[in-house]
C-alpha cells in the first residue's frame, strides 16, 4: 500500500485531534477526596486571625500532614484559600503556615463568592488527589452546592454557624468527577476556644 503525503498528514492530524480531545476531557477532580474547612478564629475587628486562630493555623501544619480522622489517612497535596478581601485575609492566613511548612503552594486567587470558578480550576488543572480548601463560612454552603453536595444535609439549617471553627467537610469524588459521599466531622485538635 502506497501512502501519500496527504494521507500521512490526515492520519497525523486525526491522531493529534483525538489526543487533544482526550486531554481536554480529563477531569482532575475525579477520584479526589476534598477537605473543606472554615478559616480559623477571628478577632472582633480587623482582617486577620485572633490568638486562637493563629494557634489553630499553626496546629494545622501537623493535623493535615497526614490527615487522619474517621478511618482516613490521606496526605493533603494541594492548598486553596479564598482570596483576600477588604474585610478578611483569614482563609489565606489559616493555610499559610501549612503552606510554608510543607512547601506546597497556596492558591488564593479565587474569591469565596465565586465557588464555580474554584470547581472549574480543580477540574481543569492538575492538583493532586487531596485538596484542602479554607473558605469563609457564609460561602461554604455555595461551595458545597458547587461540588454537588447538600448544605442542608451537612450543616445545621444549611448554614455554617458563626461560632464554629473546628469542623471538616469531607467530600469524596468518584472516577466520573461526581460527588459520591459527603460528611462533616469534628477536628480532634485540642485548642482553647474549640467546641466540644
PLM ranges: what are they?
Residues 8-17:
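Bacterial N-terminal signal peptides
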Residues 16-28:
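Bacterial Sec-dependent signal peptides at the C-terminal "C-region" and cleavage site
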Residues 25-128, 139-196:
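Active-site-proximal alpha-helix that buttresses catalytic centers in soluble enzyme cores
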Residues 130-134:
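Periplasmic-binding protein-like
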Amino acid at each position: 500500500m502506497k501512502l501519500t503525503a496527504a494521507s500521512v498528514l490526515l492520519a497525523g492530524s486525526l491522531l493529534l485531534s483525538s489526543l487533544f480531545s482526550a486531554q481536554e476531557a480529563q477531569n482532575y477532580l475525579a477520584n479526589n477526596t476534598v477537605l473543606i474547612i472554615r478559616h480559623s478564629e477571628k478577632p472582633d475587628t480587623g482582617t486577620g486571625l485572633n490568638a486562637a486562630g493563629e494557634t489553630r493555623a499553626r496546629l494545622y501544619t501537623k493535623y493535615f500532614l497526614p490527615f487522619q480522622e474517621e478511618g482516613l489517612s490521606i496526605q493533603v497535596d494541594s492548598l486553596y484559600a479564598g482570596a483576600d478581601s477588604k474585610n478578611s485575609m483569614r482563609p489565606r492566613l489559616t493555610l499559610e503556615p501549612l503552606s510554608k511548612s510543607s512547601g506546597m503552594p497556596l492558591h488564593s486567587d479565587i474569591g469565596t463568592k465565586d465557588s464555580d470558578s474554584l470547581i472549574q480550576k480543580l477540574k481543569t488543572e492538575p492538583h493532586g488527589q487531596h485538596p484542602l480548601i479554607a473558605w469563609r463560612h457564609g460561602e461554604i454552603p455555595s461551595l458545597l452546592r458547587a461540588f454537588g453536595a447538600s448544605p442542608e444535609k451537612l450543616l445545621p439549617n444549611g448554614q455554617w454557624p458563626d461560632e464554629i471553627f473546628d469542623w471538616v467537610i469531607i467530600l469524596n469524588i468518584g472516577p466520573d468527577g461526581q460527588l459520591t459521599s459527603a460528611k462533616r466531622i469534628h477536628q480532634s485538635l485540642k485548642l482553647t476556644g474549640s467546641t466540644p
